[in-house]
Amino acid sequence: MGKKSFVKGAFILGIAGIVGKFIGAFFRIPLANIIQPEGIGLYQMAYPVYIALLTISTAGLPTAIAKMVAENLALGHNREAHRIFQISFKMLAILGIIATIILAAVTPLFAKFIQNDKVILPLLSIAPSLFFVSVMSAYRGYFQGMQMMGPTAVTQITEQIGKLVIGLSLAYALVGKGVEYGAAGAIIGVTLSEVIALGVIIYIYNKHKSEIEYGIRTSPKLERIPTSRSIISQLIKIAIPI
């Protein structure tokens, strides 16, 4: 990646991060008024569990994907770069499904451990987003490897806007049934915002599909094609130290 491209990419992601934090502040203040301290407590109990599992399931894989894709594109190996994306997509989808199942399975145990059944609904509400974020990580890594930071920035802002609009709306609509429902509504907003963000990045990918396919067609075939296992192994080796 050239110096200008790196600076431009860092600037785009930096702006997206600032905008995301700004929107996030607008989310937290009214949410506290809607679901009150007990609801915020439930939200804050559920969210760290989600983040912990998300970190385990994705680790540094988006960065590893970006690195391997960029290295292959620099050599003109567009076909191999796209193959890395396809393999990482499948791997992250499987990891996302496993993480979702684990969270759903341990939720009753976690609730029993902290002696608070009200946390069950919020945790189950956020479990599916582990899959959607994991899959989106593959797309983000691929685009970043192509020196395209825009898709990552757009999806980050989409997530925050979705969480703000959908999360607050559902929290307000459901809090009358109980604080756990209000907290779950806010968290469903997080899940749906990830679904929307995934849809956005798939749309962006499809817009660039003809360009990607042209690069694949004109890419020379490698004499030695790395196996899927070796690609996964390399991804993990790069990702683990991150």
Walk through the language-model features, giving the residues of each.
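N-terminal membrane topogenesis motif
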Residues: 1-23, 79, 83, 222-242
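Interfacial/gating helices of multi-pass transporter permease domains
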Residues: 31-55, 179, 183-184, 229-235
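Small-residue-rich midsections of specific transmembrane alpha-helices
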Residues: 44-70, 131
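Helix-terminus/linker motif at the lipid-water interface of multi-pass membrane proteins
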Residues: 22-40, 111-112, 173, 239-242
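Short membrane-interface helical motifs at transmembrane helix boundaries
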Residues: 98-118
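Membrane-interface junctions at transmembrane-helix termini in multi-pass inner-membrane proteins
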Residues: 132-155
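Alpha-helical transmembrane segments of multi-pass membrane proteins
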Residues: 117-139
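Membrane-interface helix-loop junctions in multi-pass transport and translocation proteins
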Residues: 149-150, 161-204
